[in-house]
């Protein structure tokens, strides 16, 4: 007879951290240059006017202004920054 109870082992018990993807600045919001607009994997949304694309496909503002999303049919969805009138 065993003196101690045999302990089972489980192959579960792991989970990865969320990647926190998605739109960070929504349409109509005012942003400053360098603000992250969208964190994404792949180019689900493409950069438009005054928007840059990082190496991980993150879209960011190149200038101060208002965020504007546009769906251009077969060309896809674009995000642009409309500069604030001085």
UniProtKB/Swiss-Prot annotation:
Q: Which GO terms describe its cellular component?
A: cytosolic large ribosomal subunit
For this UniProt record, give its keywords in alphabetical order, as a comma-separated list: Ribonucleoprotein, Ribosomal protein
- InterPro entries the UniProt entry points to: Ribosomal_bL27 (IPR001684), Ribosomal_bL27_CS (IPR018261)
Question: Superkingdom of this entry's organism?
Answer: Bacteria
Matching SUPFAM superfamilies: Ribosomal L27 protein-like
Which Gene3D superfamilies does UniProt cross-reference here? 2.40.50.100
What Pfam family is a match for this entry?
Ribosomal_L27
Give the GO biological process terms. translation
Q: Does the keyword Ribonucleoprotein apply?
A: yes
- What Gene Ontology terms describe what this protein does at the molecular function level? structural constituent of ribosome
The family note in this entry says: Belongs to the bacterial ribosomal protein bL27 family.
Name assigned to this protein? Large ribosomal subunit protein bL27
State the species of origin. Koribacter versatilis (strain Ellin345)
Taxonomic lineage = Bacteria, Pseudomonadati, Acidobacteriota, Terriglobia, Terriglobales
